[in-house]
């Protein structure tokens, strides 16, 4: 009859292990170790109030790596903190009528408890929240330093403005051109904002990607494209008004000066000074510019919006032909990119062509294939030239370009560059798509920007001895503006330079500021300065883990801020992380019912009964509450919008933390999407119960004697061989391949093999002991609670398994004295034989021919020849 001790009870097992880890401060580390350091970090969470399965997968991956590295002799740091500022707290404050700070700290308490219930090997003594003044004071100090160096500056920039709520909206708060809360049409408004000169580091950020050998190529490609280095010419176009008066010249950057003779108009942004000048005398244009101020600023909206424009009446003078080209305002030209002006070549640019077709503007072909394959390719048409451009192997030449006809791209580039530079009409330029980082946010729940505005002295950085500028937390928050803007006691101050009356900046930092350097603060969380010498012990991060959706913004700013800290002599390294792992999404089935208006009510999978075919595919579904059918949607990323999330806490309560951890590592490789499947979770629970039973059954037969590897029989040697083969596979899977699913599969194979092993002798018992100890240690990084308990069941004192060495391969155990060969007749498997690895051919042939099942199939046949693949197959050819 099973006793409490030998029954697999996850809650009891996990509580015991976690108490031991907490009481012994098992995962607190310092820099005074003779072991090599290893810093493993998963991206810090936003304290939304509840962990989701994406969190569980992310942090379990990090925990597996951390525990494995500690077992391989490393001094491992795995910290945790909270990315605590941000818009969701403001939205929750409006909805729940609580201060953002109160909501945030309550959520942190809940999520910390959830993380601890999963048994992560986190050094909690280094924990912080980015909304704490003793964290953001250093961020403010860094900003004032950047101001003095000229790397932080203020200029006007466009924002999304809600005229009803009187507030700035983030791009994601603009829905179909309207404010998410008020429903009012959103306006584009220019207001002063603070920027960091990330463009000063553009080339270094680009070059640094070549040193990141252990970052995924897709991430590096996305960053290269975002930085967007391009070489071209900046060309000067003289401009004249309707009365032929000269105006300020237009500067246009182009990577394709070879298309210059194809320019039929020039496009400028609605905010361009020339557009504003022309609108003064053109009411129709002024009205259009006002309309263009409405709508969001996101790239997605700008790409999908209808292309609109108007002729300003101004003329740009072609720098070679002197042709007067109309200057058009176009809503797809952005003032923030390049010079806010584009030379339009509708003959060889799809966007320009769509605009030209809409407004009846000329289209000219100025590039042709040197060697067209057929008549169709000789005839210029939009679809044809798009095909040309797609085929990078084809050669082109200029046509309809006066004396430049016949030149290829490079030839035309060099000739035109030399000509324009000589005439003072242009110059070679390297341009970057990357723009300076706008760090101002017109929101309350963020780090205050440490600047004072004085009528006499202008913008003055807050002196170091007056930092931090603390954000008041006990405020009434309505959502119609920031409380600190209307708090005169907080806002009004004195100028640190002249002593006169002044006001504080009421904008707060973009929350990417906090998440751009948090990893460094973990290394010295109690330092008086931003960082101390401990930072150079731990940095760079050895393993960073997070979703690929962070490839552009967070990971770019993460790299940029590290270089700022390096240049401030706070860190020695050039890059913040050596290895980056981007885990896949957690996806799940979706279910819904249609409403009369065509909308969908999404139903959580936990509320649905499903029917499956023999392959496990869902064929039908009904709602548990009423038994009526529901529709089956696609398998999609777990999200609130599709109501297909699974609460990790429910799973931990039902199955135990180790089962949840085991499934999240077994269901898919880390970089691939993981499809949540509770049937799979149940399978992992069965495996852990089976392992628990295996160990307890073995232990019930008493302690094992010492293993004598010189006195083993064939079966015992086979088990040892399987055990040490498993060690080799799992070590490679954990260490080099990061393939945790195959590591688990290897241990499962060993468990199944061991279940068929008959250990009636003391040596067999010792062989089984070694195999079980090996399985417990191999699984420890993934199922640490279960391993903690089973290690004691196997006769060892309670200890921290991470301080035990990871199992080592005994290469002598891998040498097999016998081999099992498949026996085939005419290519079909008919039996197996076991022979000595050095058996002569005649012995192998005789054993194969006399194997009972093989002999039965050979009756009445004549053996023509026997083919032996050493160590694998015996194929008998007969007829």
From Swiss-Prot:
Which compartments does it reside in? Answer: Cytoplasm
- Segments carrying motif 'KMSKS' region: 637-641
One Gene Ontology term of the molecular function aspect: leucine-tRNA ligase activity
Q: What is its EC number?
A: 6.1.1.4
- Motif 'HIGH' region: which residue numbers? 45-55
Task: Cite the Pfam families for this sequence.
Answer: Anticodon_1, tRNA-synt_1, tRNA-synt_1_2, tRNA-synt_1g
- Tell me yes or no: is Nucleus among this UniProt entry's keywords: no
| Taxonomic source organism | Xylella fastidiosa (strain Temecula1 / ATCC 700964)
Protein name per its UniProtKB record = Leucine--tRNA ligase
Question: Per UniProt, which keywords does this protein have?
Answer: Aminoacyl-tRNA synthetase, ATP-binding, Cytoplasm, Ligase, Nucleotide-binding, Protein biosynthesis
